[in-house]
Amino acid sequence: MTRSLKKGPFVDHHLVAKADKAVATKDKKPIKTWSRRSMVLPDFIGLTIAVHNGKQHVPVYITDQMVGHKLGEFALTRTFKGHPADKKVQKK
């Protein structure tokens, strides 16, 4: 189920404040955040946001195609190492 349109997008207030400050001072340093649930707003375009994936902060450069998605979508939490190889000896 999607979020009601009358509620609007959810973004943590501290993230909006940090983004506004970075835009005002033209700071290019990544903004660290643990808020994977926050939605990408048009104000964030051109900023680099370091999203926590449970182990480290992954830098994500925000483009216009990312608007409307959540930050957690761009910082993967699981590493896929591949399926185990078939160890049975094949008959010739």
Curated annotation (Swiss-Prot):
UniProt keyword Ribonucleoprotein present: yes
GO cellular component term, pick one: cytoplasm
PROSITE patterns, alphabetized: RIBOSOMAL_S19
Domain of life from the UniProt record: Bacteria
Pfam families tied to this protein: Ribosomal_S19
Annotated keywords: Ribonucleoprotein, Ribosomal protein, RNA-binding, rRNA-binding
Function: Protein S19 forms a complex with S13 that binds strongly to the 16S ribosomal RNA.
Similarity-based family: Belongs to the universal ribosomal protein uS19 family.
Classification via PANTHER family: RIBOSOMAL PROTEIN S19P FAMILY MEMBER (PTHR11880), SMALL RIBOSOMAL SUBUNIT PROTEIN US19M (PTHR11880:SF8)
Protein name according to UniProt: Small ribosomal subunit protein uS19
Protein species of origin: Albidiferax ferrireducens (strain ATCC BAA-621 / DSM 15236 / T118) (Rhodoferax ferrireducens)
